[in-house]
Regions:
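Intrinsically disordered, low-complexity terminal regions
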Residues: 1-266
Length: 266
């Protein structure tokens, strides 16, 4: 009899856990039908944001509230017919709240959107297989993109920026961390900049890139697989490298105040 009671209790506990998970999954869930070049804006405060391209025809957003004080944070939706606009809002009655929101966004693969901005104050931002005007930023966390195309701008105050298999133009910066960017195809003639105040910068460009290139580091080494001339700075400590690749149709700047700078072929 006791064994049967324990079994029933176990089943009840399992069902309760399942219902709790279902409830968590329903913190926020909505689908939006916007057109190409419309805006997707996610403003988070604490928590990660993930954006993924998929084989669908609508923008889908799911948000999970996490933490002991999760009831004191909510998702504010001010979206319009041509704009997905979501923001994390915290109760003014509660300070030092142990609560965060994790956003998971899916967008139709191959459709260009204006991701401006996608941001979080404390958390990581990750994206794959997305296209458009991409503006990602976090104050404390990493920014990671893979297979993105368009105009990409990724920044963090404290964390790493890693961009793989990008197509288009890229600007990336961090105050404390490393910048790694791989660009497999350059489109247009947009200028590009890669910088780290305290960290390393490593960029890969197509071997046939057209660019007016400048590399610099105040405390570190320079390395390049392109025909650039590396020289010591005449007036300050550090090293510089300059050169024109092809027609020099765009400016490309790589810099670090304290770290190594490398420009390689993708």
């Amino acid at each position: 009899m006791r064994k049967n009671i324990l079994r029933v209790a176990g089943v009840v506990s399992l069902l309760a856990s399942m219902f709790a998970l279902d409830a968590a999954a329903q913190d926020f869930q909505k689908t939006y039908r916007i057109r190409a070049n419309d805006t997707v804006s996610i403003r988070n405060v604490s928590g990660d944001v993930k954006v993924t391209g998929y084989d669908g025809d609508a923008v889908s957003v799911v948000a999970y509230k996490e933490g002991r004080d999760r009831e004191f944070v909510r998702v504010e939706d001010t979206s319009t017919a041509n704009r997905v606009e979501l923001r994390a809002r915290y109760s003014e009655e509660r300070r030092n709240t142990d609560a965060s929101i994790r956003f998971e966004v899916r967008v139709p693969r191959g459709v260009a959107y204006n991701f401006n901005p996608v941001s979080t104050a404390s958390g990581n931002i990750e994206a794959s297989d997305i296209t458009g005007n991409i503006r990602f930023s976090t104050a404390s966390g990493n920014v990671t993109l893979k297979g993105a195309s368009g105009s990409i701008n990724a920044t963090t105050a404290s964390g790493n920026v890693r961009i793989e298999e990008a197509r288009g133009s890229v600007n990336a910066s961090t105050a404390s961390g490393n910048v790694e960017a791989e660009i497999t195809r350059l489109d247009g003639a947009t200028n590009m900049s890669f910088s780290a105040a305290s960290g390393n910068v490593r960029v890969r460009l197509p071997s046939d890139a057209d660019a007016d290139v400048e590399m610099s580091t105040s405390s570190g080494t320079l390395e390049t697989e392109f025909p650039l001339e590396i020289e010591d700075s005449q007036y300050t400590s550090g090293k510089r490298a300059r050169g024109r690749l092809g027609n020099g149709s765009r400016r490309v700047r790589l810099s670090s105040a304290s770290g190594d700078v490398r420009l390689l072929k993708s």
